[in-house]
Amino acid sequence: MPTPSPVTYPLGGPVIANNQITVDLALNQPALITRRISDLTLQKFIAPLIFTSSGQAVTGGAVRYQQATANELYTSRDIEQRGPTDEYPTVTADRLDEKLAKVEDWGGKFPISDEARKRNNVTELNRNTTALSNTIVRKVNTRTIAALDAAITALGGAGTFVGKNWSTAVTNGVSPTANNALPQSDFAKAQLLADQDELGVTYNLWIVNPQEAANLATTYGPALQALLDYYKIELFSSNRVTAGTAYVAERGAVGFLDYEEGLTTESWREPGKKTSWVQSYVLPVFGVTNPYSVRKVTGLAG
């Protein structure tokens, strides 16, 4: 029988203690594998950093939602000074078009031979579970970045700016890089653009490629954390982000993330091949409701 995770996204919380499970026990209780995958993936997802649950129950394979626009900032008609016996004008905000986010279904399976089961080959089980976990993370993160790119592209350039070259920044020596050409100037510029939008967005998360994370560490060394604290931002690196680019966002404000089914694991035996199968899957649905709460930064590698 399928065994869904009782915990919310990303995939549930770690429960296994000291990895003391047998292959036979795991195959008989697939929930243990679900929890193991949750343990391995807990800190690796981009989606929970920028999306939050809408609180809606997901039915019918899709979720309807509205996406914020710049026209929401002010009413379509200006307010007026009222004279004696006059009425104030009727003011409204523009009505937003509805969008539809479809539920996605991602999963995979792997075999465990009867021999591995009898001999309690925990190494084989762990190797396959880890590989499946990494693949789930890669797929969900790839889809998350694709959703961000689609929303940013729809803004027609308003959601992108060219940053400084982080790979050549120097903070000391005889020829230090000017302050307005250092990586920290991109932190300041991102928030400046958000303030100019007047939509109340505070950028507090930078999602970067490991290359850019390494360049920051090289440039600032032990002072990096103090710099991030000063700008009140958190750094998260992922190989799903193209090298030389970054995404700056307000944590939890970009959109919604729900799921028709959380991470589920099931197992069954195929007698003809003397093999047991382990299958795990997750059915997420997400959408960008506020594209102005995220920006793409390019040119970070020159």
Can you describe what each PLM-predicted range is?
Residues 108, 201-204, 231, 274-276:
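Structural beta-strand/beta-sheet cores of well-ordered domains, especially the beta-sheet scaffolds
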Residues 33-106:
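Assembly/oligomerization interface modules of large self-assembling protein complexes
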Residues 2-26, 62, 214-302:
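Sequence/fold signature of self-assembling virion shell proteins
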